[in-house]
Amino acid sequence: MSNTWFTSDLHIGHKRLMEIRNLADDVEEHDATLAKAWDSVVGKDDTVWILGDISSGSTKGQIHALGWISDRPGRKRLILGNHDGPHPMNRDAHKLVGAYWMVFEHVSTAARIRVPLYGDAGGHTDVLLSHFPYVGDHTSEDRHTQWRLRDDGKILIHGHTHSPMILSRHIHRRQIHVGIDAWGRLVSRDEIYDLVNHIHEEEGVHT
């Protein structure tokens, strides 16, 4: 049976992020560590959602990261982040679109998935995917606010913050951070389902 995985902010080949992240001593080791974490769990029929920022954002860095992702198993879907060239915030967003579509079966700025609810009531809830959280950043002020989704009460799975926290409840009670900085690995569908149900039970959300 195939699985679905979630991650964000891989920053393949990105020296500055590697130094901040403290997963490895150099970029090559950092990328190899992430490759091992991916390859050890993802099957060829699995789906991997990457919620943005595959690289440093330079043209060379993006091409390198696309090659790295292409070498990994699974079907890949991308939610664009601010370091990804095809994001419409970038003036030259059109230049690398073709290269991205060679690697990913889906490329967009946001998406929606359906998560089953546990318990006697059953049913499901819709959950949004975006690189950006509703609120929060790794800087003192929220950036790229014009590209963030409007909070209409749905749970949001995101990256971008580089926070070690999975649920930043003091900032927002319906956000799930799937970035490498929080997990150090890919997040499984069942882990997402458990977190969504936990939030749904505690907060009550729009389905």
Swiss-Prot record:
Pfam short name (any one): Metallophos
InterPro entries with a match to the protein in the record: Calcineurin-like_PHP_ApaH, Metallo-depent_PP-like
A GO molecular function held by the record: hydrolase activity
Protein name per its UniProtKB record: Gene 66 protein
Organism expressing this protein natively: Mycobacterium phage L5
